[in-house]
Amino acid sequence: MHNTPAAASPKTFDLTSTAFLIVAFLTGIAGALQTPTLSLFLTDEVHARPAMVGFFFTGSAVIGILVSQFLAGRSDKKGDRKKLIVFCCALGMLACVLFAWNRNYFILLFVGVFLSSFGSTANPQMFALAREHADRTGREAVMFSFILRAQVSLAWVIGPPLAYALAMGFSFTVMYLSAAVAFVVCGAMVWFFLPSMRKETALAIGTLEAPRRNRRDTLLLFAICTLMWGTNSLYIINMPLFIINELHLPEKLAGVMMGTAAGLEIPTMLIAGYFAKRLGKRLLMCIAVAAGFCFYAGMLVAHSPVVLLGLQLLNAIYIGILGGIGMLYFQDLMPGQAGSATTLYTNTIRVGWIIAGSLAGIAAEIWNYHAVFWFALVMIVATMACLSRIKDV
């Protein structure tokens, strides 16, 4: 696998960069086929109560953090990141097969989630490998990262509607087996087309214990991204059940809403990537938080499909900027620690799931699904407070 041709002739077809785009799309599809329907799967197929649904997401996030931090430490210190991604894809495929055929809550929680945690770690490891590839070949890392993020968003345009179509039209078994196929194809693409980039001595020094620079700002950014992703996780857990059980709207609307938001995220990410150096990452994050506040306020009062779909523009601005800027913000605050920075960012998503799982389960069990959006608004206000204290980079 070569790295030099891309730098020597950037205007010719670049097989490696194209492979990165396809792998980003496939890792996105694998997740987009599973996550949007998980709360509905647990409710309808596993017959879990709202509190148990929330606990499942919380437990999943805790296990995921332990797995991803362990893998990030090893990947930053030694070894071939490419082989690690293939290994993660293989375990992700096994997790999908287990979810396809098993309906025992505790087996899914402890065995299925353990396997799927490795599968989901393939995505941040791919982004870390892409950052190293961009740095070594002289590519503009910010825009390349945004293009990869756009591929994940494209997968989420297709994934949620397809997931609901497969689950409702056929079965959850068919849906999970489709995700397993995505992992198999992804692993094959990584093995045959992505570069092997051995760690040099200078890079092997990096550790995962803590950022070597900007520790206070990294901690603030961790809190900011955790709260923002937490609100998004509340939405993903709660929205399908809110749409179906409280608003009594068609099941497919939930998938269409997620797909619409993901489609609008693509131009949002690209525009944010273009303006990142001109406006600064902090200002863009402020714009995202403002859009998020308006979005969740709108979810409290919206009841018609047209309004719910219209609100997805605000959701796209919120998640589109967060999804692209957040990762780069961590990498800029932690130079020389690409794997740790990327995985630390990914763990804000997982910690967000921990918070969201607990809040969503308790709120739905005690009050209703509508009440969950009030918690999201409170979390966004806390995000604003943290954002006012972080420095720009």
Give the positions of each predicted feature.
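Structural signature of the two symmetry-related core transmembrane helices
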Residues: K83-V97, A180, L283-G298, L377
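Central cavity-lining transmembrane alpha-helices of secondary-active solute carriers
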Residues: F55-G73, G259-I271
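A late C-terminal transmembrane helix in Major Facilitator Superfamily
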Residues: G336-I366
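C-terminal transmembrane helical hairpin of 12-TM major facilitator-type secondary transporters
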Residues: R282-G326
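Helix-to-loop junctions at the C-terminal end of transmembrane segments
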Residues: V67-D80, A167, T268-G280, A364
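Intracellular juxtamembrane helix-capping segments at the cytosolic ends
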Residues: S120-D135, I321-M334
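Helix-loop boundary and gating motifs at the non-cytosolic
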Residues: A7-A61, W229-E246, A254
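Hydrophobic core of transmembrane alpha-helices in multi-pass small-molecule transporters
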Residues: F25, F106-N123, T226, V307-I321
